Amino acid sequence: MKKAFLIVTALLGLSLAAVAQPKAVGLRGGLFGNEFNGEISYEHWFSIFDNDYDFLEAELGVFGGNGFKGTLIYNVTLVHPEFTDRGDWGLYIGPGVVTGYGTGVNNKDELKSFAFFGLAAQLGMEYTFWFPLQVSVDFRPSFMIPAWMNRSELGKNANRWCHFAFGVRYAF
């Protein structure tokens, strides 16, 4: 009985803590090379190691009009400067994973479909206004492993794996 009570109490406490954490949902995108990449973005902040500004970022999106991808990144806020009296600034960095499916041209100029997975990193800056709006700019290099590419073919598709983006989110 004590174990059941402790488990229920712990689960209730975790659910209340999850509800109390700040979140943001919106769009992230940019023009990379001659291709547009756009994503639906969700951020969930939480506290680990006494840092209240860590957040998990999950995104689903399209790239180049011929593929889709999903990204999950754990961001740690490096600095949280007080530049202004209102609003919050943050400079963050984090590792993550990415997976997806698309088409691309190999070194024989053949159009191929491919699935990919890989590791990503992110360095960015965001500003959350005193009203529920957040804007961000970030740089995200990714190391992808497409199923059909060999090492010489990675260069032709490099603009898909390293890019800058701008984000606009509703913070709640």
Pin down the residues of each PLM region.
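Short glycine/proline- and aromatic-enriched beta-strand/turn motifs that initiate or cap beta-hairpins
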Residues: 19-70, 169-172
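Cleavable N-terminal export/targeting peptides
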Residues: 1-22
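Predominantly the C-terminal beta-signal and adjacent terminal strand-loop region
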Residues: 130-172
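Extracytoplasmic loops and strand-loop junctions of Gram-negative outer membrane beta-barrel proteins
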Residues: 23-24, 106-107, 150-151
